[in-house]
Amino acid sequence: MRHLVVVLLLALAVPALAQSGPPVEPGRFLAPDLVELTTLDPTIRLDVRYARSDNFLGRPVYREARAFLQRPAAQALVRVHRALREKGYGLVVFDGYRPWAVTKAFWDATAEDKKVFVANPKRGSRHNRGCSIDLTLYHLDTGAAADMGAGYDEMSPRSYVTWEGGTKEQLDRRELLRGAMDREGFFVYPWEWWHFDYKDWREYPLLDVPFEQLGKPASAPVAKAP
């Protein structure tokens, strides 16, 4: 009986232990090389809502409003930003690298019927690898965020890539963003027009390093409201 109790206690403990950090993955990965985006191009704007309360959780989950990617992805994103300038747009970044603990907080706080919009912490997120980016466009002439037909983190069909209910201008901007990102190796997530994954995401491990351990913050322009 004593052995049975021990076995049951261990069985109950395993799931809890499994959620105490990123899942352990087999294989070999490239060494992480997270770069703060605004150090490569300070004209990339930041609107890091997870450092504020105006997000779907209603509370900050980052202590600092910063955005990072693995170096090859960051360099590719700078090329996207500069190419879009020829079309009259720049990039506003909502989120890049995301510590695993934040992914778990998102999952725990999201209703079952909305979990298509958040990553399962048991598998980890491509954001945790520093290879995903959430972003939108802004108008160079006015500095205002572009109207994309659905807001960031809007958990509705309007956020789907296949949504066709917007205006021609909204859909054209989505297509412009997708095309520019695709040419530099970023592929859109079908359920979120703002979310793109870098082609080499499988090469990097899942990370749970908070921003404050990634060096001194760099200054960045603040995004204007649409």
Model-derived segments and spans:
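Segments that shape or occlude catalytic/ligand-binding pockets
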Residues: 99
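Short, well-ordered surface patches within globular domains
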Residues: 102
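Bacterial N-terminal signal peptides
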Residues: 5-15
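Extracytoplasmic cell-surface/polysaccharide-interacting catalytic and binding patches
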Residues: 18-96, 106-191, 200-226
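Conserved metal-phosphate-binding beta-hairpin within the catalytic cores
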Residues: 196
